[in-house]
Design a protein with these regions (language model features):
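Auxiliary alpha/beta "docking" domains used to position bulky ligands
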Residues: 1-171
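Iron-sulfur cluster-binding cysteine motifs and their immediate structural context
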Residues: 4-6, 177-190
Length: 190
């Protein structure tokens, strides 16, 4: 048990997200995150990050286990819930690498590469494509069980594994809760 709450499999092709992603960049929605403008060829063609990639294994690791504990007094500074505790990059990379080695032990030597916010990966789009959740009006991946309180990690592998069902339907519908509570009013109208 690696501690992941969900594991999904999908193909590496995310080219159908290219136009939408680039239009958000051109509109300036990425603010000062200039790295989102770079390496677009790799972003839209995941197999170029790990040649021979046939399957992307996506994992979800929840970081908010006690929702009641997340309530913070308004007279104190706030710390993002994901920043409390150990560095998730290290935790997830270790677990993903272990998972990759376990798969490798079962399926002859395979090539794999693990990612946790470490490369130009369209992880939300890959996760949406796999059926793990849907991208909400707040641009986060939303999941029925965890909301948006989770980390994503990926393993690119050369093994053609069976993939999960297609993307979930967007369940936001007419809901605007995330837009209403955003303290900076950062999101344009959908």
């Amino acid at each position: 048990d690696m501690g992941f709450q969900q594991v999904h499999f999908t193909r590496p092709d995310v080219s159908h997200y290219q136009a939408q992603h680039w239009s958000q960049i051109e509109a300036g929605y990425h603010a000062d995150m200039d790295w989102l403008e770079r390496n677009t060829d790799v972003r839209y063609h995941p197999e170029s990050l790990h040649p021979g990639t046939q399957t992307v294994i996506l994992v979800r690791l929840d970081y908010l286990m006690d929702r009641d504990a997340a309530v913070i007094a308004s007279d104190r500074g706030d710390i993002a819930q994901y920043a409390v505790g150990r560095d998730y990059h290290k935790v997830m990379r270790r677990r993903l690498t272990q998972l990759g080695h376990e798969i490798q032990a079962l399926l002859d030597p395979i090539g794999f590469r693990a990612f946790v916010d470490s490369a130009p990966v369209l992880e939300r789009q890959l996760a949406e494509q796999s059926g793990m959740g849907w991208i909400g009006k707040n641009t986060l991946l939303l999941n029925d069980e965890a909301g948006s309180w989770f980390f994503l990690g990926e393993i690119y592998t050369s093994v053609p594994l069976p993939t999960d069902s297609s993307a979930q339907s967007n369940r936001c519908n007419n809901c605007r809760a995330c837009l209403k509570v955003c303290p900076t009013d950062a999101f344009p109208e959908p």
